[in-house]
């Protein structure tokens, strides 16, 4: 990959400033600079990590075939253009090698591309063969990927259903909290009304005692004249009765212990 960067810069330099000694010197200085600074090795390491560790995107068989065909056409086109500029097969092959040191002071040839590594293996090992994909492995892997894709779709659907369930439960929780708040408010209001009712009944009993009236509190409240008053002549002995209240209104135990209210 670093060599491709150098080649691209060399091509741009020659096309811009001409194919002369100055352009060649500039390209050599650039290559020496990135080697000395470590940028060359960093680019190679990134390239190796990309091709070894990256996860390929999901593609159909036809898409892979089309991309391979396009890649082959581009490579052939680049080779043809290189041949017209004097960059023959020999030049391309030798450019993929570099001189290095084995650590013992011996000069060795170092391949810089995967293809050059294969060429070097073929040079001294006539029995060298590239490992092939085991029979049926590709089909098996494709089936496993399809199965995993189905499982993934099922899990996505279940996750979506769980999210909807959680959302509904959150809504139920909010409604329950609101209902609980309303219930507490109603309890407080009911207790306040009960206290006011009891106080009103107490006051009524006190007033009845003060004015000599009888007050009967059961399911309703009845106020009548006292039996101690004398009968009026010429009239029937009738007791004026005033009833009010609603069923269920019972006076508390405090009323039974009341004395006359002054």
Swiss-Prot record:
Residues 138-179 form a coiled coil. It comes from the Viruses. InterPro entries: Rotavirus_NSP3 (IPR002873). Residues 229-238 have a biased composition (Basic residues). GO terms for cellular component: host cell cytoplasm. GO terms for biological process: regulation of translation. The keyword Coiled coil applies. GO terms for molecular function: RNA binding. Keywords: Coiled coil, Host cytoplasm, RNA-binding, Translation regulation. The keyword Nucleotidyltransferase does not apply. Residues 226-249 are annotated as: Disordered. It is found in: Host cytoplasm. Its main location: host cell. Belongs to the rotavirus NSP3 family. May play a role in stimulating the translation of viral mRNAs. This is Non-structural protein 3.
């Amino acid at each position: 990959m670093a060599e491709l960067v150098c080649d691209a810069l060399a091509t741009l330099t020659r096309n811009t400033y001409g194919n002369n000694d100055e352009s060649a010197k500039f390209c050599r200085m650039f290559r020496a600079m990135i080697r000395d600074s470590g940028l060359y090795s960093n680019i190679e390491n990134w390239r190796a990590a990309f091709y070894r560790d990256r996860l390929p995107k999901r593609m159909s068989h036809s898409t892979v075939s089309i991309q391979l065909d396009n890649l082959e056409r581009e490579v052939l086109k680049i080779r043809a253009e290189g041949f017209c500029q004097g960059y023959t097969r020999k030049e391309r092959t030798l450019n993929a090698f570099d001189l290095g040191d084995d650590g013992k002071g011996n000069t060795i040839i170092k391949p810089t591309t995967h293809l050059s590594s294969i060429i070097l293996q073929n040079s001294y090992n006539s029995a060298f063969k590239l490992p092939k994909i085991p029979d049926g492995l590709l089909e098996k892997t494709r089936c496993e990927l399809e199965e995993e894709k189905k499982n993934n779709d099922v899990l996505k659907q279940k996750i979506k259903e769980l999210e909807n369930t959680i959302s509904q439960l959150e809504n139920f929780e909010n409604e329950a909290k609101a209902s609980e708040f309303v219930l507490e408010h109603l309890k407080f209001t009911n207790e306040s009304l009960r206290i006011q009712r009891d106080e009103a009944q107490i006051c009524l009993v006190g007033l009845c005692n003060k004015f000599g009236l009888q007050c009967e509190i059961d399911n309703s409240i009845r106020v009548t004249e006292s039996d101690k008053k004398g009968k009026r002549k010429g009239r029937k002995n009738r007791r004026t009765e005033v009833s009010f209240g609603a069923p269920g209104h019972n006076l508390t135990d405090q009323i039974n212990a009341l004395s006359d209210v002054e």
